[in-house]
Amino acid sequence: MAIIALAAGLYVGKTALGSSSSSSSPYLVVGTNIPFPPFEDYNYTNGVYFGFDINFSMLIASALGKTLVIDNYADFSVLLADVGAGVVDMAASAITESGAVGALRNNSMSFSIPYYDANQAIVVTSGSGLTCAQTGCTAAQLEALSIVVQTGTSSQSWLQQYVESNETGGSVTGLTTVDSEILALTSGEFQAMMIDLGPAQSIVASSGGTLKIAGEVFTNELYGFAVPHGDPNHILPTINNVITQSEANGTYAKLVKEWFGGA
């Protein structure tokens, strides 16, 4: 199918393509926030977006009979605000729709049925002595650490709720991008980074042995695709049908195997 990839690192509103939210528009403008592998990432050599969410966006655009336009946002918080304001037709960026975070987000946007179950992870440098039990990292283990997290995420919300208020010599700092988080961690500015498990595994795998996962935080989150509140463009039924059909016909399992290495 045809895909228009707006340059990574740039924000381009839907006015660049006309009224993309119109039912007569040939475009489905999907906002995302890279890098967040294996859900969404970008190949700077060939200018191609790729990942689990990108593949699903392609399926959804095809089902709607539209050309997919991927619009990358440098700031995850701005992406969430813009989908709520109708600047993009849909947001596909590993967005948590469950729990307290999801309840707040549902005030300004609407979600598809869940398409992925997720937990969090604590990433540290390979020389760190922090190790969590199989039952997961506890807030008590994290309270004394300097932790970096991406602003506007469910990771930050968890840390604010369970760790920040009980800090004993530690700190929680939000940064705009995942790249800046990784740089701050590897440079020794922070002792740990909290991020969703899937991206944590990808980041560690590509770190050349400099990073490791100290343990998981079992938050039992559900991801959903977000649209403007109330679904004014009436695309949620199609999105939900794509999710349901992909699970029934084996497409979902194939995508999980491709991007996560398992069934």
PLM region descriptions:
Residues I54-L64, T125-L130, A144-S154, G224-A263:
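Extended ligand-binding regions for polar small-molecule ligands
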Residues I70-A81, Q134-T135, V172-S187, N220:
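Short helix-initiation/N-cap motifs at beta->coil->alpha
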